[in-house]
């Protein structure tokens, strides 16, 4: 059929109609559709869409895959998440990338002329052969270690796309190409630079470690234990009397957290227990042995101690209970740790040790166990209830009407327990045995502790974490997967929470504790940073050392270019400058800080009553999160790395954020947000959907002279001075050849606030540089890039979430802030209603006393209560103290009128509040913040201008 068409451009259209009946199916199955989808992405990856201007769409949706590198991202994640090295040949026929394989097995994804070669072929051998051979040579040169080719290859995953002339395959499925390399029609040489990057990606280090395993195993054998009657020379170890004997199978080795825990455990043991129970105190956390070098493992004192205590031999398998009884000094390991997240981590590290080194022991039912001890107790009269995790307690508190009447005792660690309580623990013996669940147990333990499985941990935390999910402490057997998913996950989540902030307030835990303490102390007058950090530790239960706290306080107060757009604390003293990126701050003993006046405009005091405060050992500490009136997470920018996650967000202009929220509230369109750095004189330019170019500033002042007036954000003045010195001296390449100097001389008039370098080039050199690609910006390194694609943050449910862009983050923030206004309004209505009721009752009470309608003299408390009740006075907090405790001088006619005026004013304010919408409340506070920010910004600009006009000494380099 010949049909006329409107288009003048030639094209080919291929359609097919599957004969479902012929294939015995009713339609396309999900697997078939998945295959089509996979092939669709394959086509996108191997077709040069930019050059040929070909567009791809599947079911009407355009593909986001534009090149082979983006296709690789679908396998291993974005470049920011997973390291890889990419290279393409000059002829355009070859492009390839290498990453570290997730398991110890070589993997390849390859294409020949657009055909997916699942099984590989000569083209794969051709490229991987070069990579492995050159890596062997590189490692031998750098490390003086001869590495087997298989040791390198098994670490790699290769992505390869190539064009071969007349390729031949071993079957009609074309999944293996067997054309010899001399008939490829082109050649590909893997560059030395590519090899160096692959080696530094971690391949060289791992290959060296694996190569040395054989030799080091000999050393490991020297630390082996054996089943002996006694073990000597192990510090702080208390051996069971029957260990190493014919009855060793009934002996239990307790691994506890520290010496204080050991003392408590000893006090709880009976004489019979001492025969079968041994105790070894761990010094903090065990080494994560997964992926570690054998040398590091054999040099670890705790691990070598455990080998001797248990009689463990390196490389030996203990498959059955009988093997344990015959070869080991103990028949069971019991872990006793604090009931907090760090205790869970120690349990996990113990499991990981045996799973890595003696995996068969993790499969023997009950060989590894732990004892549950209370994290808190609730007492009322003679009744005592024990709770073994926060989830149990919170569920009980919610379900118990009189929970507030119970006395709560927290057991922060095992050291909190008394001797009689330890005796109780061993009498009750709430021992939980770990159970092996086939391959799922192996996978989940490896996933949590394998450094190479960061992406899997990321998925695990996002999909599995729930703040109210805890182990059922009534169980006597728990699978490894259940332990990891319901207990250990809280440690990983908390580890992230210390490094990655909440999207609502943009604060990490330490910063939130600092802000909480500043608000609690009403820090409106200056205090030494060292003193304030002590106050924070005491009042917010900060447990990670005051050194890191001092650093966090200093960072919150810094206000140089590239630090904070809004510093929540004031820097009264030397808190660091852009000269050295804040590293030049003075000691915390000599500098002072206080709340910035703008801080309460961002975090209104009226919110404090409706925040959800956390509880630490019975002490009210910081809230779960603050709810600032603009998304503060975007004000100062964020950088953080946690378990499997990282977060990187540039800062934005507070004025733009105020306008964004205002427009959302009033139904107006919102403008695109562009990263902003307070005081930065350069430019920020969008170059991709999620990528920005940051440029410094220079001015040409003569034929061979420029003045650099701004550096890209994050490049500090002294760092750049060193760079200029190197450019003036000339550089030396890796072969020792020295190149000519790029600049002739430079002069620095830089201050701690402003950049001012005068750079002189050799005669005629500047014109040459300006004419070259990238020009002065590139040569002088006056540009850098930032991305907005790595936004992982905690949401309102305390779950980690990936935000595709900042607008999506603002959407989530907006709903949480709106709900906070709703809670605040209801709380204020209740507070004002109660105040009006109290004032009404007080006015009426004074009036009744004045007219002798009530006479409380010589009356019992019971009679007084009955009299007030009969006159319809309201009880407040269950009694009438607010009335009967009123001073006698308040019982006057004037006070009646005063109380009624206060009541009427309160009722008027209440009515105004009821008529005020949530939007109006928010807009009013945005207006106030905008005015406050205007003053704040002017003050910063004035400070910068004042420094700029000061006379500075001249520094010349020649």
Question: What kind of region is each of these model predictions?
Answer:
Residues 1-958:
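Conserved phosphate-chemistry cores used by DNA topoisomerases
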